[in-house]
Design a protein with these regions (language model features):
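Charge-dense, helix-prone N-terminal extensions
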Residues: 1-126
Length: 126
């Protein structure tokens, strides 16, 4: 998948937007949720190749890294929850799209479970 095709795929997701937030860096593109501005993909150059960082379930991350040479622990992000995917590699376009949709869902604030309150409730409030 080419960089332009990938960015177009991200732009076409309902509720997604893309931008280039880094000063003087016009090569990197962030795909984010329109309402929360939370990232779900970071497209950039790494080792002379175009890559995308995507959020992933930790168990699936390990599996994908073992199956595809083009999937490695994320560059410059949490390596447990994020993978770096080489766009023009052994990873099929449909798999890159699936991983992107997963990242989109995992970073969607509306889908996340509420955090447990750290405050203790009284045993007998009455």
């Amino acid at each position: 998948m080419t960089k332009d095709a990938y960015i177009e795929f991200c732009k076409n997701l309902v509720g997604a937007d893309t931008d280039q937030p880094f000063n003087e860096d016009f090569e990197s593109t962030v795909a984010r949720h329109f309402d929360t501005k939370k990232w779900f993909a970071l497209v950039m150059e790494y080792q002379g190749k175009t890559v995308v960082n995507l959020k992933c379930d930790p168990m699936e991350s390990d599996f994908l890294r073992s199956v595809f040479k083009g999937v490695i622990p994320a560059y410059h992000m949490n390596k447990v929850h994020w993978n770096t995917v080489f766009l023009e590699s052994d990873v099929p376009d449909k798999e890159i799209e699936r991983m992107t949709l997963t990242s989109f869902e995992l970073t969607d604030k509306k889908k996340r479970m509420p955090k447990k309150s750290s405050k203790k409730s009284p045993k007998n409030p009455l």
